[in-house]
Amino acid sequence: MRDAQKQLATYQELRELPQANLNLYSQALQRLGYMLNVYKSGDPVLYVQSRTILDSTNLSSPLAGAEIPGDVTEMVRTALNRIGAKVVYVPYHPDYLVAQAQLGGQFGVTMPDYLITGALTEFDRALSGAGRANNASVEFGKGHGSTTLGYNATNVAIYSALALDLNVVNFQTQQMVPRMQSSNVVKVLDMTSERNASLGFYGDAFGFKTEGKYMQGRHSAIRTLVDLSVLEIVGKVTNTPYWRTIPNGHPDPVVVENMRNAFEALSPQVRIGLAQVMLQKYQQPVQVTQQLDAPTAQAVAQVYAAHFPQLGAQIDLTRWEHFEPLFFNVPMPWDEEFKREAAQAQEAAQRQAEEAAQRARTQAAPVRYEEG
């Protein structure tokens, strides 16, 4: 009884508490929600619905080993619902609605603005791989009793690739929105390490074997892929600089081009008014007058001197080249965190380069011999 209680206490200490299932892009979705509150503060809510997102590779079939999930629709819903109040997911359950209506239920139905379609389109197993094996054996004691020692080490690493394609459909027209799609690939690592050792006397042998295997979960990789794809889709639809929600993100040319075309289609007065709206997001006390008045000129001088000094002192808010940085670089709470992480990564890379250079100099140094 005492041993059972002791064992129970030991395992209770080792028991892990539930943890949030978050990855880099899950946090990015939450940041996108904050960004939408800043960029789209006066815009209506975006209602989104999705078709069933299935596996088109058929590798989710039990006959193929069911290596990947066959339906990732719920992952897409979770990712969309994580963004925040500016993006609302509209479920599609017609059977449930009909049944409730027959029971006397009264409710309204919200029509979505956009429909998301797509599928898991690629699963390349063993896309690339590498392995190494080392063997050694020693025999001694011949004539006086044979003894054999053996050792074997094997390491194998294999990469697989998963791809997800998502597209956006305008619900009112039932037409795909041009260039509003995401097609992303994630690589999954499967690594195996095996060690064998044996010892034999007179032909009788005993030995041991240790084997370790590390395989990134394909379901977890697909969730990361879904979060990334939803982030890209919503960022494109809303023309929001979503790439700023992840470290070292690069501007999306589709969003940049769409914003440029929309800006250049405006009259000069409306362009100035839009710039005044953006200056307010930099905490500048300006009014939207669509005129380059004194408060606006002062705010422009302060903001551009602090954030974009490379553009000089002569700023023309009606030119896209001068408006673009103002629009895409509104300060966000996580900017400083990203800067610190980038600086730390740069310092670590520089330190590793210096250590490698020092090792190279040490190995290249000539060896001197002194005569005694």
Could you describe each region identified by the protein language model?
Residues M1-P44, T154-S267, E347, R351-G372:
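C-terminal/domain-edge helix-coil "capping" segments
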Residues A28-L32, I68, V72, V76, ...:
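Stable alpha-helical elements in mature extracytoplasmic
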Residues D43-S128, A161-D165, F171-P178:
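N-terminal segment of the mature soluble domain
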Residues R51-S56, V88-G104, N248-V254, L292-T296, ...:
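Acidic helix-start/capping segments at beta-turn-to-alpha-helix junctions
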Residues D55, R77-A85, V230-Y242, Q280, ...:
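Sec-exported extracytoplasmic/periplasmic mature domains
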Residues T57-E67, N152-A153, E211-H219, A262-P268, ...:
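Second-shell loop/turn segments in exported
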Residues A265-G273, Q280-Q298, Q302-L326:
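Short acidic, glycine/serine/threonine-rich helix-capping segments at coil-helix boundaries
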Residues D316-G372:
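Short, low-complexity, Pro/Ser/Thr/Gly-rich segments in the mature regions of secreted, periplasmic
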